[in-house]
Protein backbone atom coordinates (compact mmCIF):
# COMPACT_ATOMS: atom_id res chain seq x y z
CA UNK A 1 0.00 0.00 0.00
CA UNK A 2 1.39 3.39 -1.05
CA UNK A 3 0.88 5.95 1.72
CA UNK A 4 2.84 8.71 -0.01
CA UNK A 5 0.82 11.75 -1.17
CA UNK A 6 0.26 12.09 -4.91
CA UNK A 7 1.01 15.18 -7.04
CA UNK A 8 -2.56 16.55 -6.80
CA UNK A 9 -2.61 16.08 -3.04
CA UNK A 10 0.73 17.85 -2.73
CA UNK A 11 -0.65 20.79 -4.74
CA UNK A 12 -3.61 21.11 -2.36
CA UNK A 13 -1.33 21.01 0.67
CA UNK A 14 1.12 23.50 -0.86
CA UNK A 15 -1.67 25.98 -1.64
CA UNK A 16 -3.02 25.69 1.90
CA UNK A 17 0.45 26.02 3.39
CA UNK A 18 1.25 29.17 1.42
CA UNK A 19 -2.04 30.77 2.45
CA UNK A 20 -1.59 29.88 6.12
CA UNK A 21 2.01 31.10 6.18
CA UNK A 22 0.97 34.46 4.72
CA UNK A 23 -2.40 35.06 6.41
CA UNK A 24 -2.18 33.02 9.63
CA UNK A 25 1.50 33.08 10.63
CA UNK A 26 2.49 31.76 14.04
CA UNK A 27 3.39 35.30 15.11
CA UNK A 28 -0.32 36.19 15.12
CA UNK A 29 -0.86 33.90 18.12
CA UNK A 30 1.20 36.09 20.41
CA UNK A 31 0.02 39.34 18.85
CA UNK A 32 -3.69 38.45 19.14
CA UNK A 33 -3.60 36.56 22.41
CA UNK A 34 -5.93 39.07 24.10
CA UNK A 35 -8.42 39.27 21.20
CA UNK A 36 -11.88 37.76 21.60
CA UNK A 37 -11.26 35.33 18.74
CA UNK A 38 -7.95 34.05 17.36
CA UNK A 39 -9.07 34.60 13.75
CA UNK A 40 -10.96 37.75 12.65
CA UNK A 41 -14.25 37.20 10.81
CA UNK A 42 -13.00 38.48 7.45
CA UNK A 43 -9.93 36.25 7.60
CA UNK A 44 -12.07 33.26 8.57
CA UNK A 45 -14.15 33.81 5.43
CA UNK A 46 -10.94 33.79 3.41
CA UNK A 47 -10.08 30.40 4.91
CA UNK A 48 -13.52 29.15 3.90
CA UNK A 49 -13.24 30.56 0.37
CA UNK A 50 -10.04 28.58 -0.10
CA UNK A 51 -12.01 25.43 0.77
CA UNK A 52 -10.24 24.67 4.03
CA UNK A 53 -13.55 23.79 5.74
CA UNK A 54 -15.19 21.75 2.98
CA UNK A 55 -12.45 19.72 1.34
CA UNK A 56 -14.10 16.40 2.27
CA UNK A 57 -17.72 17.56 1.96
CA UNK A 58 -19.77 16.14 -0.92
CA UNK A 59 -19.91 18.31 -4.03
CA UNK A 60 -23.71 18.40 -3.92
CA UNK A 61 -23.38 19.92 -0.44
CA UNK A 62 -21.01 22.62 -1.65
CA UNK A 63 -17.74 20.88 -0.89
CA UNK A 64 -14.84 19.59 -2.96
CA UNK A 65 -15.76 15.93 -2.57
CA UNK A 66 -12.22 14.85 -1.72
CA UNK A 67 -11.40 11.73 0.26
CA UNK A 68 -10.64 11.62 3.97
CA UNK A 69 -6.95 11.03 3.32
CA UNK A 70 -6.90 14.41 1.55
CA UNK A 71 -8.49 15.93 4.65
CA UNK A 72 -5.83 14.25 6.76
CA UNK A 73 -3.08 15.85 4.69
CA UNK A 74 -4.79 19.23 5.05
CA UNK A 75 -5.03 18.88 8.82
CA UNK A 76 -1.38 17.85 8.99
CA UNK A 77 -0.59 21.13 7.25
CA UNK A 78 -2.86 23.02 9.66
CA UNK A 79 -0.91 21.46 12.52
CA UNK A 80 2.44 22.33 10.96
CA UNK A 81 1.34 25.95 10.64
CA UNK A 82 -0.12 25.96 14.17
CA UNK A 83 -3.37 27.26 12.66
CA UNK A 84 -5.76 28.67 15.24
CA UNK A 85 -9.53 28.82 14.85
CA UNK A 86 -12.39 26.30 14.79
CA UNK A 87 -11.17 24.36 11.75
CA UNK A 88 -11.95 20.95 13.23
CA UNK A 89 -15.38 21.86 14.62
CA UNK A 90 -16.54 23.64 11.46
CA UNK A 91 -15.25 20.93 9.12
CA UNK A 92 -17.19 18.29 11.04
CA UNK A 93 -20.26 20.47 11.67
CA UNK A 94 -20.73 21.28 7.98
CA UNK A 95 -20.69 17.55 7.30
CA UNK A 96 -23.14 16.74 10.11
CA UNK A 97 -25.56 19.48 9.02
CA UNK A 98 -25.47 18.22 5.42
CA UNK A 99 -26.03 14.60 6.49
CA UNK A 100 -28.99 15.73 8.62
CA UNK A 101 -30.57 17.52 5.66
CA UNK A 102 -29.90 21.09 6.79
CA UNK A 103 -28.28 22.34 3.59
CA UNK A 104 -28.65 25.99 4.58
CA UNK A 105 -26.72 25.57 7.83
CA UNK A 106 -24.09 23.43 6.14
CA UNK A 107 -23.58 26.13 3.50
CA UNK A 108 -23.31 28.89 6.11
CA UNK A 109 -20.70 26.95 8.06
CA UNK A 110 -18.76 25.93 4.97
CA UNK A 111 -18.71 29.49 3.62
CA UNK A 112 -17.42 30.91 6.88
CA UNK A 113 -20.61 32.90 7.51
CA UNK A 114 -21.22 30.92 10.70
CA UNK A 115 -18.78 29.34 13.13
CA UNK A 116 -19.29 26.37 15.42
CA UNK A 117 -17.75 25.74 18.83
CA UNK A 118 -16.48 22.31 19.80
CA UNK A 119 -18.08 21.10 23.05
CA UNK A 120 -16.16 18.39 24.90
CA UNK A 121 -17.87 16.53 27.74
CA UNK A 122 -15.80 16.36 30.91
CA UNK A 123 -16.70 13.67 33.42
CA UNK A 124 -20.14 12.07 33.63
CA UNK A 125 -22.91 13.22 31.33
CA UNK A 126 -24.76 12.42 28.14
CA UNK A 127 -25.22 13.71 24.61
CA UNK A 128 -28.90 12.94 24.02
CA UNK A 129 -30.28 14.82 25.78
CA UNK A 130 -27.26 17.05 26.31
CA UNK A 131 -26.31 17.12 29.97
CA UNK A 132 -23.15 17.45 31.99
CA UNK A 133 -20.18 19.78 32.18
CA UNK A 134 -18.57 20.76 28.90
CA UNK A 135 -15.48 22.61 27.74
CA UNK A 136 -16.30 24.77 24.74
CA UNK A 137 -13.55 25.69 22.30
CA UNK A 138 -13.85 28.93 20.27
CA UNK A 139 -17.39 29.82 21.43
CA UNK A 140 -17.16 33.57 20.66
CA UNK A 141 -19.58 34.44 17.87
CA UNK A 142 -20.71 30.84 17.42
CA UNK A 143 -24.44 30.11 17.23
CA UNK A 144 -24.01 26.36 17.50
CA UNK A 145 -21.81 23.85 19.26
CA UNK A 146 -20.75 20.41 18.08
CA UNK A 147 -20.79 17.52 20.55
CA UNK A 148 -18.98 14.43 19.27
CA UNK A 149 -19.58 11.11 21.03
CA UNK A 150 -19.17 7.43 20.22
CA UNK A 151 -22.92 6.87 19.84
CA UNK A 152 -23.46 9.89 17.62
CA UNK A 153 -22.85 13.57 17.00
CA UNK A 154 -25.07 16.48 17.99
CA UNK A 155 -25.35 20.02 16.70
CA UNK A 156 -26.68 22.13 19.54
CA UNK A 157 -27.90 25.69 19.86
CA UNK A 158 -25.11 27.27 21.89
CA UNK A 159 -27.70 29.13 23.96
CA UNK A 160 -28.67 25.72 25.38
CA UNK A 161 -25.43 25.74 27.36
CA UNK A 162 -26.58 28.74 29.35
CA UNK A 163 -24.01 31.07 30.93
CA UNK A 164 -20.47 30.38 29.76
CA UNK A 165 -17.58 30.72 32.18
CA UNK A 166 -14.31 31.83 30.62
CA UNK A 167 -11.37 29.48 31.14
CA UNK A 168 -7.78 30.67 30.90
CA UNK A 169 -6.21 28.32 28.36
CA UNK A 170 -2.49 27.56 28.57
CA UNK A 171 -2.40 27.91 24.78
CA UNK A 172 -2.64 31.61 23.82
CA UNK A 173 -4.07 30.60 20.44
CA UNK A 174 -7.19 28.96 21.90
CA UNK A 175 -10.28 30.48 23.53
CA UNK A 176 -12.16 28.30 26.02
CA UNK A 177 -15.25 28.43 28.19
CA UNK A 178 -16.98 25.91 30.41
CA UNK A 179 -20.69 25.33 30.98
CA UNK A 180 -22.92 22.90 32.85
CA UNK A 181 -26.13 21.76 31.16
CA UNK A 182 -29.02 20.16 33.02
CA UNK A 183 -30.85 18.93 29.91
CA UNK A 184 -31.05 20.16 26.32
CA UNK A 185 -32.16 18.60 23.06
CA UNK A 186 -29.85 18.85 20.04
CA UNK A 187 -30.85 20.75 16.95
CA UNK A 188 -29.54 17.88 14.81
CA UNK A 189 -28.52 14.37 15.78
CA UNK A 190 -26.46 12.08 13.54
CA UNK A 191 -26.22 8.56 14.99
CA UNK A 192 -23.00 6.61 14.58
CA UNK A 193 -24.91 4.00 12.57
CA UNK A 194 -25.35 6.61 9.83
CA UNK A 195 -21.79 7.96 9.95
CA UNK A 196 -18.91 7.42 12.35
CA UNK A 197 -18.12 11.04 13.08
CA UNK A 198 -16.24 10.27 16.32
CA UNK A 199 -13.73 8.16 14.42
CA UNK A 200 -13.46 10.79 11.70
CA UNK A 201 -12.92 13.53 14.28
CA UNK A 202 -10.27 11.47 16.04
CA UNK A 203 -8.40 10.84 12.78
CA UNK A 204 -8.41 14.55 11.92
CA UNK A 205 -7.23 15.42 15.44
CA UNK A 206 -4.45 12.85 14.99
CA UNK A 207 -3.55 14.51 11.69
CA UNK A 208 -3.28 17.91 13.38
CA UNK A 209 -1.10 16.36 16.08
CA UNK A 210 1.05 14.82 13.36
CA UNK A 211 1.57 18.27 11.88
CA UNK A 212 2.59 19.62 15.28
CA UNK A 213 5.09 16.78 15.66
CA UNK A 214 6.57 17.42 12.22
CA UNK A 215 6.86 21.16 12.79
CA UNK A 216 8.49 20.75 16.19
CA UNK A 217 11.02 18.36 14.67
CA UNK A 218 11.75 20.76 11.81
CA UNK A 219 12.22 23.72 14.16
CA UNK A 220 14.62 21.79 16.38
CA UNK A 221 16.59 20.38 13.45
CA UNK A 222 16.97 23.79 11.81
CA UNK A 223 18.14 25.28 15.11
CA UNK A 224 20.65 22.45 15.55
CA UNK A 225 22.07 23.25 12.11
CA UNK A 226 22.43 26.98 12.63
CA UNK A 227 23.09 27.48 16.34
CA UNK A 228 26.84 27.46 16.96
CA UNK A 229 28.81 26.90 20.14
CA UNK A 230 32.60 26.96 20.21
CA UNK A 231 32.62 27.50 16.46
CA UNK A 232 30.52 24.44 15.57
CA UNK A 233 26.79 23.82 15.03
CA UNK A 234 25.29 22.15 18.10
CA UNK A 235 23.94 19.45 15.79
CA UNK A 236 27.38 17.85 15.57
CA UNK A 237 26.90 16.50 19.09
CA UNK A 238 25.33 13.05 19.30
CA UNK A 239 22.90 14.04 22.05
CA UNK A 240 21.42 16.67 19.73
CA UNK A 241 21.55 14.82 16.41
CA UNK A 242 20.05 11.65 17.90
CA UNK A 243 17.22 13.66 19.45
CA UNK A 244 16.47 15.30 16.10
CA UNK A 245 16.47 11.97 14.28
CA UNK A 246 14.15 10.46 16.88
CA UNK A 247 11.79 13.39 16.41
CA UNK A 248 11.72 12.98 12.63
CA UNK A 249 11.06 9.25 12.95
CA UNK A 250 8.22 9.86 15.41
CA UNK A 251 6.59 12.38 13.07
CA UNK A 252 6.93 10.02 10.09
CA UNK A 253 5.41 7.14 12.05
CA UNK A 254 2.51 9.36 13.11
CA UNK A 255 1.80 10.40 9.52
CA UNK A 256 1.91 6.83 8.21
CA UNK A 257 -0.38 5.52 10.95
CA UNK A 258 -2.84 8.40 10.60
CA UNK A 259 -3.09 8.00 6.83
CA UNK A 260 -3.58 4.26 7.24
CA UNK A 261 -6.30 4.88 9.82
CA UNK A 262 -8.08 7.21 7.39
CA UNK A 263 -7.91 4.59 4.64
CA UNK A 264 -9.14 1.88 7.03
CA UNK A 265 -12.06 4.07 8.12
CA UNK A 266 -13.01 5.01 4.56
CA UNK A 267 -12.78 1.38 3.46
CA UNK A 268 -14.89 0.07 6.33
CA UNK A 269 -12.20 -2.33 7.50
CA UNK A 270 -13.01 -4.44 10.54
CA UNK A 271 -9.92 -3.09 12.30
CA UNK A 272 -10.78 0.57 11.59
CA UNK A 273 -11.30 1.44 15.26
CA UNK A 274 -7.97 -0.18 16.17
CA UNK A 275 -6.22 1.88 13.51
CA UNK A 276 -7.94 5.11 14.60
CA UNK A 277 -6.99 4.57 18.24
CA UNK A 278 -3.44 3.73 17.16
CA UNK A 279 -3.25 6.92 15.11
CA UNK A 280 -4.26 9.28 17.90
CA UNK A 281 -2.00 7.44 20.36
CA UNK A 282 1.07 7.54 18.11
CA UNK A 283 0.43 11.09 16.90
CA UNK A 284 -0.37 12.40 20.38
CA UNK A 285 2.83 11.00 21.81
CA UNK A 286 4.87 12.27 18.86
CA UNK A 287 3.46 15.79 19.16
CA UNK A 288 4.00 16.12 22.91
CA UNK A 289 7.38 14.39 22.96
CA UNK A 290 8.74 16.23 19.92
CA UNK A 291 7.71 19.63 21.24
CA UNK A 292 9.18 18.85 24.67
CA UNK A 293 12.42 17.60 23.10
CA UNK A 294 12.48 20.65 20.85
CA UNK A 295 12.44 22.93 23.89
CA UNK A 296 15.52 21.08 25.16
CA UNK A 297 17.30 21.45 21.82
CA UNK A 298 16.65 25.20 21.91
CA UNK A 299 18.07 25.34 25.43
CA UNK A 300 17.30 28.48 27.41
CA UNK A 301 15.68 30.11 24.37
CA UNK A 302 13.10 27.33 24.26
CA UNK A 303 11.60 28.51 27.52
CA UNK A 304 11.02 32.10 26.41
CA UNK A 305 7.63 33.42 25.35
CA UNK A 306 9.14 34.79 22.13
CA UNK A 307 10.18 31.32 20.97
CA UNK A 308 7.60 29.32 18.98
CA UNK A 309 8.38 25.80 20.14
CA UNK A 310 6.49 26.02 23.44
CA UNK A 311 3.34 26.94 21.49
CA UNK A 312 3.47 23.56 19.76
CA UNK A 313 3.69 21.79 23.11
CA UNK A 314 0.68 23.64 24.49
CA UNK A 315 -1.41 22.97 21.38
CA UNK A 316 -0.40 19.30 21.45
CA UNK A 317 -1.70 18.90 24.99
CA UNK A 318 -5.05 20.42 23.99
CA UNK A 319 -5.61 18.26 20.90
CA UNK A 320 -4.42 15.11 22.63
CA UNK A 321 -7.30 15.33 25.11
CA UNK A 322 -10.15 16.29 22.75
CA UNK A 323 -11.86 12.96 22.11
CA UNK A 324 -10.70 10.84 25.02
CA UNK A 325 -8.10 10.86 27.75
CA UNK A 326 -4.82 9.35 26.46
CA UNK A 327 -4.74 6.68 29.18
CA UNK A 328 -8.31 5.61 28.36
CA UNK A 329 -7.56 5.54 24.64
CA UNK A 330 -4.44 3.45 25.24
CA UNK A 331 -6.37 0.99 27.42
CA UNK A 332 -9.02 0.59 24.72
CA UNK A 333 -6.35 0.22 22.07
CA UNK A 334 -4.74 -2.63 23.99
CA UNK A 335 -8.14 -4.28 24.44
CA UNK A 336 -8.83 -3.93 20.71
CA UNK A 337 -5.45 -5.43 19.90
CA UNK A 338 -6.12 -8.47 22.10
CA UNK A 339 -9.51 -8.94 20.45
CA UNK A 340 -8.14 -8.99 16.89
In which residue ranges do the predicted regions lie?
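FAD-binding core of flavoproteins
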Residues: 82, 95, 103-218, 222
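Short clusters of hydrophobic/aromatic residues that line enzyme substrate/ligand-binding pockets
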Residues: 29, 87, 164, 189-190, ...
